[in-house]
Amino acid sequence: MKKLATILILCGMLLTSVIPAMGMDYGDYLNSALEFMQDMYYLDMDDEEALKAALKGMFGELDPYSGFYDNQETQMINDSLQGSFVGIGASLEKCDEGVRIVRVYEDSPAERAGLRDGDIILAVDGVSTFGKEPSAVAAEIRGEEGTSVTLTIQRPTGRLDIAVQRGLVEINPVSWRIEEDVAYIHIESFTSNTSGSFQKAMDEIERRGITKILLDLRDNPGGYVDEAVAVARKIVPEGLITKLDFKSERLSDKEYYSDLKNSPYLLAVLVNENTASAAEILAGAIQDSGKGVLIGQKTYGKGVVQNMFYVLTPEAYAKYGKKYGLHYITSVEWLSYEGVLLDPDDLLGTIKLTTGHYLTRNGRAIQGVGLAPDIEIADRTLPNGIDLALINPLKNTATLTLDAYGDDVCQAEKILRAAGYFNGTPDRRMDQETQEAIRKFQAENRIPATGDIDAQTRDKLNERLDALRAEYDPAYMRGLSLLKSF
């Protein structure tokens, strides 16, 4: 059995740096464990696979948020936190048949090609996806802008091949609208462009002289702390926003402040059990400032923060160790301490590690506790999978007919699906399936069943949207009525 010399050095360094007080050399022990795994495991495993498995086990067992990710997985994480990337614009999950599309992004190459939520990807350019992880399939789909990839798709109606031209996918994590004298703002997550998108919404809100904001943070999993802080600085009055407290002396504790004097905004914030992490930082800052109330359910309670560290390959670790006589395993150590910028080929993947926790303005630590709402009310339900709060009322005054394309078509399909008239996946094109659903809706509402969206049909659809919200989203309606009462 081949000795795993460089793996021993790398993993031994990791272990001894974590538990130096024990005064023990775990290198030989770990080397024996790796050799045992390679020898006894029923599938062949090369040195790099063994190392990655060891790192995944080492960091993945620390807590639910820490772990090791190879370069493909790292790319997926980075894409999810960026405002734009080159790809097709679809989120994937593993399923029995292969990999399933769980979300097609609006106005993306995937949507334009006709891909739908729920499509099962059986093959990429003729290569089966069976047994593969979503990250591996995503890597196969990814490519240069302007090139094409052919996906073999399984639907209930049968199998088909769909060619998709890769392109720039821009994800806007902020959506908003005006309802009378209230601005509704939904923040999906805190990606690299969240604060910029939020500022664009605030510019228009300020231009209209609106000071009442219904902020929807439900199901927001968090993201970049800096982005959540940047949003808070636009609406939370001066004072502490949050404090990050780290154990390691290599990371400096940090306090974030707002210098906004005399904030004019009255805030109602919608939260639920999936409001987490950076979203809780924003919600906690609003609650502690006294400028807003939380409405809904207790939040998730993720009060710890993670840092991402790029990890060297064993070869790079040995190369730089020999050259400099130093033994750092992460790129940030080489850059911070020695000014050495590593090549991408030197990197094995990333370690995401829980490094500290945060406190709210009033000193609350919410890890495992969450934020209790000021007004507790049942969370929304999603009729036929539709989030009613995210539907915009129809505004297009022109009659929409077969093959019409645009946002109003998508909003109408969402209303029709929530109301049980439409079984398809809402998109931006009116096809025969859309028109058939409209005819059913028109007939039940005593409107001429043309299948087109005229003024009368538009008004009835908007009325149905209001009725659906009243039935299925009490938190939204409570927040709206509360703000309108002032």
Enumerate the language-model features and the residues they cover.
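Sec-dependent N-terminal signal peptides of Gram-positive bacterial secreted proteins and lipoproteins
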Residues: 1-23
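C-terminal, low-ordered peptide segments at domain boundaries
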Residues: 122-210, 253, 367-398, 465, ...
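A short glycine-leucine-enriched loop at secondary-structure breakpoints
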Residues: 109-120, 142-144, 285, 418, ...
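Short acidic, glycine/serine/threonine-rich helix-capping segments at coil-helix boundaries
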Residues: 399-465
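Conserved acidic, small-residue-rich alpha-beta core segments centered on
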Residues: 207-214, 220-385
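PDZ/PDZ-like domain micro-motif
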Residues: 25, 106-119, 172-173, 408, ...
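Conserved PDZ fold ligand-binding element
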Residues: 110-132, 213-216, 437-447
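Extended, small/polar residue-biased N-terminal targeting/export presequences
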Residues: 40-100, 148-164, 173, 473-477, ...
